Each structure stands twice: as C-alpha cells, then as structure tokens.
Amino acid sequence: MTEDIRAYMQTLGRQAREAAREMARADTGHKNAALHAMADALEEHAGDLKRANADDLENGRANNLDPALLDRLELNDERIHGMAEGLRQIAALPDPVGAIRDLAFRPSGIQVGRMRVPLGVIGIIYESRPNVTADAAALCLKSGNAAILRGGSEARHSNAAIAACVRAGLKRAGLPGEAVQVVETTDRAAVGELIRMDEYVDVLVPRGGKGLIERITAEATVPVIKHLDGICHVYIDDSADPAKAISVAYNAKTQRLGTCNTMETLLVAEAIAERVLPELARRYRESEVELRGCEATRRLIPDAVPATKEDWSTEYLDAIVSIRIVPGLDEAIEHIARHSSGHTESILTEDWSRARRFLREVDSSSVMVNASTRFADGFEYGLGAEIGISTDKLHARGPVGLEGLTTEKFIVLGDGHIRE
C-alpha cells in the first residue's frame, strides 16, 4: 500500500511540475478567464456541491464531529456564491508575474533588474473548510503556479466536487487541468510523501490546527510557509487616549474570538491603568470574556482570575484575555519579545516617538499603532484574498497574497557585452 501511495503522489508531482511550466507562460487574460470560468462552474453546479457536502456532513455527524467544525464544513447557496465571488475578486487583482523593478545600467553597460516569477508547484494541506479548495486554487493560478491540494478527510466529497469545477474552468480557458490536483486518498501516508517531494514541490502551505502545522514543519523537507500561534498583544501606553484605548482593546478581543489575529494578552502602563481597566473590564464582562490578571491587575479588577506563567504564552482562541500592568514601554516590549508568537502587536499611544520605537523594536509580522489587531488580514491590507499568514522571516512574512506566492529572479540585458 505504501508503494502504491508513493507512486500515486509521484504521478501527481510530475503532472503538477509539467502544468507549472505551462502556467508560468500563461498570460493574465487566460488566467483571469479561467478564474471567471471556475466561478461560473461553481454556481452552475451548486446542486452537485451541496449533494457532495451533504455526504460529508452526514459522515461528520456520525463521527461526532465538533459542531464548530460542522459549521465550517457546511456549504450552502450563500457560501457557494461567496466562493464564486471570491474567485472573481482574485481575477480583478493585479497580476504580479512578469513585473520588473530596479532595472538600471551598470558601469559595464549592461542593465540589471529583477523580474517577479511564480514559485512553481505549491502543496497546500488544510482541514475542514472546503472553500479553501477554491480560494487556494485561485491564488495559485493567478500567481502562475500549479497546486497540489490535500484537504481534510472530513471534507473529502466537497473538495472533490469543488476541484471538478476548478478543472472545468481551467479547461474552458485552455489551461492544463493538472494545474490544480486534489489528493483523493485519505491515507495519511500521502501527506508524508507530499511534504518530502522536493523534486516536484517548491513550497508547502499548511492551514489548520497547531498539531498539523507542527507535524508538517518537523517532518517536511520541502520549505514551509506557516504560523503556529497567534499570541497577539495590545499595549496601552500611558499617553493613550482612554476612550480610544478602551474601544480598540475591546474590539481586538471580542470582534471575533477564534482567529489568529485576536488579541490574547493586554498590556497596560501602570500610569493609565486606573483610567482604562475598570471600564474595559465591565465591557469584557458584558461579552462574557473571562479576565485573567497579574496581581496589580487584580487590585483593580478583584474578580479577575490569577494569571499563571502559562497564560502569557497561550493562544486561547476563546473568550479569555490575560491582562498585565507594566511600568512602561520598555517592559511592554520586553514582555512581547519573550511571549509573542510573532504574529501581530499593537500600541495605543498619542506619543509618536513611542509609536515609532514600538514599530522599530517589536519583531512581529505585523506591528500597529492605534489599530485593532483584527486588521491583520490580507483583504484589509489590500492584498485581496490570502493563502495564509506567515510568522517566519523567509520567504514571506505576514498575510501571504499573490505576491507572496511568487519570487524574483535577476534579469540582465546586454548588446554583445563581454566581461573584461
């Protein structure tokens, strides 16, 4: 069986590599036509998608899948239309492929510049949400790449139905159907093969729980674009506008609880703590957020649960917030350096010199001033859809959109130039 899986995955890899060469040559018009055709196919086959999805939902209920996962798994008319519109929006985005920058003459007379080109073959491993099949395929195609998609077994039928629409759209536009391939087996050995296919796969993007991403990172020989945790911080400086600070800190925690850009730890300068924490605590309680605090915090909020050492390094993804009162900016930056996952941090301040220092010294993929961490999102950043968020420093960092799925090569223009 292992040999069969290896042979199957090698076939997918070879087909993807061949398709990637064709996609790299495809012009913007053909890629956009494919995206529109894919969107049309999703809406035309909405009935087929819902029937396939019903099988997945039935299996999920039989296997006692968590209600939240069942909700993510469900496809209805609204979500199918949303997927289709997402593809059309990606078609409307600028095509990064072929863009040339920094073209300049050198003393030798040659011109040297950089051209943006596709990465090649992208392996995407994800869980639960079948819409990722369409989103990931579209981003890979618009950026001139081929994709091998391995979704969760709980969405097997839905993913296959969406992939059929994607391939139909590619073929309508005259592009290779093998540019997007879905791993059809549920055997986990297929993932083990995919993450080690260096000869065919250029980069992996895992999307899912921490356990999945840790496994991929530990076992892959192919480079990985990923983030493990979203331990995001908001620091309220003593120069902050109290009303503004309360509003932002409340939004950063409560606007949506289970996302990687939700604030998990609130740091407050001791000089402003009495002016913001009682009101902020009241608002958190109204939203049924559990408060965990240091000793100084609990003197202002007596019903707060004592925070443990582990709380400062925990991504709750739940209605829980840790609060620590610190002497000032130095201690806030030090706390973030020790406990942050490198995702997103924000300072609330009216002192621009402190804001600039925070921007310069905090080493995370997104650093903000007077804004909610919930803005750390490809759409909000003007990137359009994103394939994920990277907290690594190589190759991409922060929300990864179309440009993050490309790289650069040097181009040199001459006219018979030789090196003396």
Swiss-Prot record:
The keyword Amino-acid biosynthesis applies. Pathway: Amino-acid biosynthesis; L-proline biosynthesis; L-glutamate 5-semialdehyde from L-glutamate: step 2/2. InterPro entries: Ald_DH/histidinol_DH, Ald_DH_C, Ald_DH_N, Aldehyde_DH_dom, G-glutamylP_reductase_CS, Glu-5-SA_DH, GPR_dom. GO terms for molecular function: glutamate-5-semialdehyde dehydrogenase activity; NADP binding. Its EC number is 1.2.1.41. Keywords: Amino-acid biosynthesis, Cytoplasm, NADP, Oxidoreductase, Proline biosynthesis. GO terms for biological process: L-proline biosynthetic process. It comes from the Bacteria. It catalyses: L-glutamate 5-semialdehyde + phosphate + NADP(+) = L-glutamyl 5-phosphate + NADPH + H(+). It is found in: Cytoplasm. GO terms for cellular component: cytoplasm. HAMAP family: ProA. Belongs to the gamma-glutamyl phosphate reductase family. Catalyzes the NADPH-dependent reduction of L-glutamate 5-phosphate into L-glutamate 5-semialdehyde and phosphate. The product spontaneously undergoes cyclization to form 1-pyrroline-5-carboxylate. This is Gamma-glutamyl phosphate reductase. It comes from Alkalilimnicola ehrlichii (strain ATCC BAA-1101 / DSM 17681 / MLHE-1). The gene is proA.
